[in-house]
């Protein structure tokens, strides 16, 4: 995130905002949904487990990224579906193949979450 320039395309916020605007210009009558990434962990080169919920790797934690995604969606009229806290959480390790990538059960939970949004 670049506080001085919210259109900075080298940031997640700036790139996401630009992408949303491009879709809105090209397809003005569609409703856009953004699905967040699910919770996950990974192991660094030293064998340390990185918890993306609390460990800042230099550009913020995953929660920072989620907040930037939510803000970009809010400012641009895009529906945001939270899978990070809403579908796959730190308790759902059986939904991940390697601590981060979804397995079949994880994909089904994401699909269920997506389906619930459309039923509302």
Segments and roles (model prediction):
Residues 1-119:
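Alpha-helical cap/lid subdomain in secreted, periplasmic
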């Amino acid at each position: 995130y670049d506080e001085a320039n919210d259109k900075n395309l080298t940031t997640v916020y700036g790139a996401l905002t630009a992408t949303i605007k491009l879709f809105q210009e090209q397809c003005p009558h569609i409703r856009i949904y953004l699905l967040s990434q699910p919770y996950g962990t990974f192991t660094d080169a030293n064998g340390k487990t990185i918890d993306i919920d609390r460990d800042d790797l230099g550009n913020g934690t995953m929660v920072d990224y989620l907040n930037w995604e939510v803000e970009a969606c809010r400012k641009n009229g895009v529906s945001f579906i939270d899978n990070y806290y809403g579908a796959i959480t730190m308790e759902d390790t059986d939904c991940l193949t390697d601590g981060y990538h979804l397995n079949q059960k994880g994909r089904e939970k994401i699909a269920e979450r997506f389906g619930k949004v459309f039923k509302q």
